[in-house]
């Protein structure tokens, strides 16, 4: 049985995008229950809130109203190689990001580092791993990545396109099977166990491979090392029951993740698909303190958008329409508009209908001074310097119930994980890095173990699991 990345990869990283609140304050959202006005934004995990809840992953279908979610920054053609420590440091902590995509091309929750000319994504002992997301959205294009997966039963690596209404195009790699990458797709989160296909390569852990997804209005093609391994035609996805094409068709972010599909807290079917219970006493855990995967390069070619797309704005300059916006909660391709509206929030209490971003000097963090220090990738500004008044979003670290377990172990002195230890002995001076950089691994641990989020973790996990079965 095959299970969706939506329900499990992101369930395993439940707290990565939105604010964790006390269990008594948690408000859920679904097709039968929309968010209230004071917590108007429905996260992709079915939890209502403000601030970061209204950014990437905000589901317009179940939010308070259509304007609760912020516009989605538009992606241009780019190429990025993580071939230096500075490139990895440009990846911004999710908790520092409030929607200004000129500030960073990538955000992360969990643990990232630089090693051997690559971005190293990590999953420490008894944690839920790491998610790296683009800050911009692609609406049709060709996306490719050169990577080495993790390994061992229960360990899952993923490279996906994922939209806010839960359209999804995947490459997934289960660690017990290193020769059969899985391609997959979903439309608006609808589970279909027949969508997955296997391909054949040599060892995905030992060797770099190039994986591509070529997404157009009419078809999706998957490639490995330049060879086409699968084609999906839109016409073959017609659903007579719903009277629509079950085909990914909405603007999507690029995401990489490393997560414990075989964690004992997961459903039995998830554990079986992932290759059994994860071994938290493995050689990698003993030697390094974490499982890991390498991302060497990522690139995207943005295709022309559909000719009949509507415009939300008065400008006659195409370049001013820098973001996508929905005009209906149906969430189909015909409901996508281009807009000139800002994509960032002024504070973590802001929402799409009250963004608090009228000040032209506002960035993703209100009351801060921003200075451009470098350029790279798909955006003009990828590295910034901010003053001490910087305000961060209430986004918790990349952990759930498993992290709470790790916290308990840490208090007894048995958890000796050092996220900056690096594979092969690379050690980074985390004390000298800024908390907004990917090199701040010690800060990431501090965030991960923050006592203020633990009270909401268990409730969030339970709600996420319940939402899957409903």
From Swiss-Prot:
Post-translational modification: The GPI-anchor is attached to the protein in the endoplasmic reticulum and serves to target the protein to the cell surface. There, the glucosamine-inositol phospholipid moiety is cleaved off and the GPI-modified mannoprotein is covalently attached via its lipidless GPI glycan remnant to the 1,6-beta-glucan of the outer cell wall layer.
SUPFAM superfamilies reported in the protein's UniProt record: Concanavalin A-like lectins/glucanases (SSF49899)
Gene Ontology biological process: adhesion of symbiont to host; carbohydrate metabolic process; chitin metabolic process; fungal-type cell wall organization; growth of unicellular organism as a thread of attached cells
Lipid moiety-binding residues (GPI-anchor amidated serine): 440
GO function term, MF aspect, one: glycosyltransferase activity
Annotated active site: 168 (nucleophile), 172 (proton donor)
Residue ranges occupied by any GH16 domain in the UniProt entry: 95-282
Paired cysteines (S-S): 58-69
Claim: Zinc-finger is one of the keywords in the record: no
Effect of inactivating the gene: Leads to increased susceptibility to cell wall-perturbing agents, defect in filamentation, reduction in adherence to mammalian cells in an in vitro adhesion assay, and a prolongation of survival in an immunocompetent mouse model of disseminated candidiasis.
Region Disordered: start-end pairs: 347-446
InterPro entries: ConA-like_dom_sf (IPR013320), GH16 (IPR000757), Glyco_hydro_16_CRH1_prd (IPR017168), Glycosyl_Hydrlase_16 (IPR050546)
Keywords, sorted A to Z: Cell wall, Cell wall biogenesis/degradation, Disulfide bond, Glycoprotein, Glycosidase, Glycosyltransferase, GPI-anchor, Hydrolase, Lipoprotein, Membrane, Secreted, Signal, Transferase, Virulence
Polar residues bias (residue ranges): 409-418
Induction line: Up-regulated by heat stress, calcineurin, micafungin, and fluconazole. Protein abundance is increased at pH 4 compared to pH 7. Expression is also regulated by RCH1.
List of residues binding chitin: 172, 259, 270
Catalytic activity: Random endo-hydrolysis of N-acetyl-beta-D-glucosaminide (1->4)-beta-linkages in chitin and chitodextrins
GO (cellular component) term, any one: side of membrane
Domain of life: Eukaryota
Entry membrane topology: Lipid-anchor; GPI-anchor
Propeptide residue interval(s): 441-470
Annotated family: Belongs to the glycosyl hydrolase 16 family. CRH1 subfamily.
The protein's name: Crh-like protein UTR2
Organism from which the protein derives: Candida albicans (strain SC5314 / ATCC MYA-2876)
Origin organism lineage: Eukaryota, Fungi, Dikarya, Ascomycota, Saccharomycotina
